[in-house]
C-alpha cells in the first residue's frame, strides 16, 4: 500500500477541551462573507443603509442579500460537535477532500479579523463531514452539517422582497388606481393614530388584524426578476410603462420617510428579457436602485378596496 492511501489515524486529544469547532463569539460582528461551492463564488458585505436587508450581495451581482440564507449558513456552523481530530498532513488532506476543499468560507469581522473555513468530504455512511481552519494544523471530523451548503446557488442569496417596510413601521398607506390617462382614484387610504388604531380619512376605525392582513399582502410581494442589468433600450421601455402607472402606492413611515411604488399594467415585452406576453408587470420603488418584474399571479392584490378592510372581507 502506498503512503498516500494509508488509513488516517485520529489524534489523541482530550475532546472535553475541543467539544465544538467554533465559539459563539467567532461569528460576532461579521462585516464580510465570501462563500464558495461548486455552484459559484459569492461575496457579501454588511449593508450600511440596510434598506431591505442587513446584508448586500456584491458578487456576482450587486443586490440586497437574503437574510435567511446568511443566517442559515451561520447557524449551521455554530454548535458543530467534534467527533475526532486528525493531523493536517498530506495524507489526511487528500483522503478528506481538502485539496482543494469542496467548499470554502472566509469570514471577516468589523476589526478585520479573518477566519477561513474549509469543508471537505461528506461521508454518507457515518453521516459526518470534515472541516479545517486555515490557521490550524488539525482536521475535525464532525456531524454532517444540517443546512445543505453544497446546494446554495445565486438565487438563494438574492432578496426578492420588493417592499422594505414592516406593518409596525407604517404610519400611512395609500393605494391609487389610474382612471383614463391622467386621473386617479383612491382605493385605500388608511393611517395609524397615536393609539395605534387604523383609520381612514373620514375617521372610521378599522380592525387592526384586518388592516395588517391587507398591508402584509402588499409587503410580502416578491419579484420574479430584478431588472439590474439595464440597457438604454430597456430603460426607455421601463420608463414608458411606469411613467403613468396603472396603480401607485405611497407609504409614509413612522420615521418620516415617504416611499412611492409605481405599478404598471400587464406588459407585452421587454428588450432582452425572455417573458410570456401579458404575464408580468413592473414595480418601481423610489427607494430601490432597480425595478422589479412580477408575475401576474400577484396582480389581484391591487383590486383590494378600503371597504373590504372595514367589512373584514379580505
Language-model segments: residues:
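Secondary-structure "cap/kink" motif recognition
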Residues: 1-314
Amino acid at each position: 500500500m502506498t503512503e498516500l492511501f494509508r488509513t488516517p489515524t485520529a489524534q489523541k486529544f482530550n475532546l472535553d477541551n475541543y467539544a465544538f469547532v467554533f465559539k459563539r463569539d467567532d461569528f460576532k460582528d461579521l462585516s464580510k462573507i465570501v462563500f464558495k461551492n461548486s455552484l459559484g463564488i459569492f461575496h457579501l458585505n454588511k449593508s450600511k443603509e440596510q434598506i431591505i436587508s442587513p446584508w448586500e450581495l456584491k458578487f456576482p451581482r450587486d443586490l440586497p442579500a437574503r437574510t435567511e440564507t446568511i443566517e442559515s449558513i451561520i447557524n449551521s456552523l455554530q454548535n458543530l460537535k467534534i467527533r475526532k481530530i486528525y493531523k493536517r498532513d498530506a495524507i489526511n488532506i487528500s483522503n478528506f477532500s481538502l485539496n482543494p476543499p469542496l467548499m470554502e468560507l472566509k469570514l471577516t469581522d468589523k476589526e478585520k479579523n479573518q477566519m477561513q473555513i474549509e469543508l471537505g468530504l461528506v461521508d454518507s455512511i457515518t453521516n459526518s463531514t470534515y472541516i479545517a481552519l486555515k490557521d490550524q494544523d488539525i482536521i475535525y471530523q464532525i456531524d454532517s452539517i444540517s443546512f445543505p451548503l453544497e446546494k446554495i446557488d445565486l438565487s438563494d442569496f438574492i432578496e426578492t422582497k420588493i417592499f422594505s417596510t414592516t406593518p409596525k413601521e407604517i404610519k400611512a398607506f395609500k393605494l391609487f388606481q389610474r382612471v383614463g390617462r391622467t386621473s386617479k382614484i383612491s382605493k385605500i387610504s388608511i393611517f395609524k393614530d397615536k393609539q395605534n388604531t387604523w383609520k381612514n380619512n373620514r375617521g372610521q376605525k378599522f380592525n387592526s388584524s384586518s388592516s395588517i392582513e391587507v398591508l402584509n399582502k402588499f409587503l410580502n410581494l416578491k419579484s420574479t426578476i430584478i431588472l439590474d442589468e439595464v440597457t438604454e433600450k430597456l430603460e426607455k421601455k421601463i420608463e414608458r410603462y411606469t411613467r403613468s402607472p396603472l396603480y401607485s402606492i405611497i407609504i409614509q413611515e413612522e420615521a418620516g420617510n415617504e416611499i412611492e411604488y409605481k405599478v404598471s399594467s400587464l406588459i407585452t415585452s421587454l428588450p432582452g428579457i425572455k417573458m410570456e406576453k401579458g404575464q408580468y408587470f413592473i414595480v418601481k420603488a423610489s427607494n430601490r436602485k432597480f425595478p422589479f418584474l412580477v408575475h401576474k399571479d400577484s396582480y389581484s392584490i391591487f383590486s383590494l378596496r378600503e371597504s373590504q378592510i372595514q367589512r373584514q372581507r379580505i
